[in-house]
């Protein structure tokens, strides 16, 4: 397992919902990654929908797959 120093965190937008709690996420740099939900998000029943801004954790060994570790709050004024 990679230590926390080796992990890369990036923000992105969910563009597609796939079976088994998998999501296609477009990162800030334009790349798309396949991401699954972390255990804490699953345990707290946080819903991830299309268009949500999320923080994705990537390992330097495989930059095509990641883990959604945080769903950013939407601005409540809009």
From Swiss-Prot:
Localization of this protein: Plastid, Chloroplast
Keyword Signal: no
PROSITE patterns xrefs: S1_IF1_TYPE
InterPro entries given in the database record: NA-bd_OB-fold, RNA-binding_domain_S1_IF1, S1_domain, TIF_IF1
UniProt function note: One of the essential components for the initiation of protein synthesis. Stabilizes the binding of IF-2 and IF-3 on the 30S subunit to which N-formylmethionyl-tRNA(fMet) subsequently binds. Helps modulate mRNA selection, yielding the 30S pre-initiation complex (PIC). Upon addition of the 50S ribosomal subunit IF-1, IF-2 and IF-3 are released leaving the mature 70S translation initiation complex.
Family: Belongs to the IF-1 family.
Protein name (record): Translation initiation factor IF-1, chloroplastic
Source organism per UniProt: Ostreococcus tauri
């Amino acid at each position: 397992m990679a230590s926390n120093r080796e992990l890369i965190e990036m923000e992105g937008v969910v563009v597609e919902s796939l079976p088994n709690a998998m999501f296609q996420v477009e990162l800030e740099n334009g790349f798309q990654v396949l991401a699954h939900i972390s255990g804490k998000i699953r345990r707290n029943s946080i819903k991830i929908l299309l268009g949500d801004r999320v923080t994705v954790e990537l390992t330097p060994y495989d930059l095509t797959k990641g883990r959604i570790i945080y769903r950013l709050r939407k601005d409540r004024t809009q």
